[in-house]
Design a protein with these regions (language model features):
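An alpha-helical, amphipathic repeat domain used for nucleic-acid recognition
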Residues: 1-193
């Protein structure tokens, strides 16, 4: 690429070449990622394979299959050291989503994206006593819709809109209509839901 047509101050940034992939580098990338974020085995596998693919794209002679084996070795080592634990990851994520009022469908989709099995997600939801009515109330409270609107007139005017919001969030129509029938709930009733 020629830079003659660019003034000195407007030259495009040159992309830095990817660093060489080695087993130790993959381990360091994995540790750095786990230091910042809890992860599932499958999710970390994707992160590490993405790095391998970036390096292989710039260096066609690089043996990707060997690097993929290094990735598997790193994952196995991290599991033995309990740095990676899908059960722990699932529990943390399910608890977080339940605390902010997310429906089961949303939780299942998000965790499936991270490589967690459906059976494991369902088991965790059952262990944590998932209650769709409670979750819908939490979401309604957070968004100040339905029974948490400030006055009765606003509730009547926005009933359909509020129902649509909860249904789009993933709650069943029966649960949503039940929530909409609840009388006004003042904001100071925090934990009585």
């Amino acid at each position: 690429m020629s830079y003659e047509n660019y003034p000195e101050t407007e030259q495009p940034k040159r992309k830095r070449p990817a660093k060489k992939i080695t087993p130790q580098r993959l381990k360091n990338i994995g540790l750095y990622s786990l230091k910042r974020f809890e992860s599932s085995v499958e999710n970390l596998r994707l992160v590490l394979q993405k790095r391998v693919n970036q390096y292989a794209k710039e260096n066609p002679e690089f043996n990707k299959q060997e690097a993929y084996q290094w990735v598997e070795n790193v994952l196995t080592e991290f599991e033995k050291l309990h740095y990676l634990d899908d059960d722990r990851f699932t529990e943390i994520k399910v608890r977080h989503y339940l605390s902010i009022g997310k429906p089961a469908r949303y939780i299942q989709n998000k965790l499936r994206e991270k490589g967690i099995a459906n059976a494991q997600i369902t088991e965790m939801l059952e262990d944590l006593d998932y209650n769709p009515r409670e979750m819908a109330l939490k979401l309604a409270k957070r968004k100040k819709i339905g029974p948490f609107r400030s006055d009765e007139e606003a509730r009547k005017l926005n009933r359909q809109k509020d129902m649509a919001t909860l249904i789009r969030a993933g709650f069943d129509y029966d649960v949503v209509s039940e929530i909409m029938e609840i009388d006004f709930i003042a904001d100071d009733k925090d934990d009585d839901l």
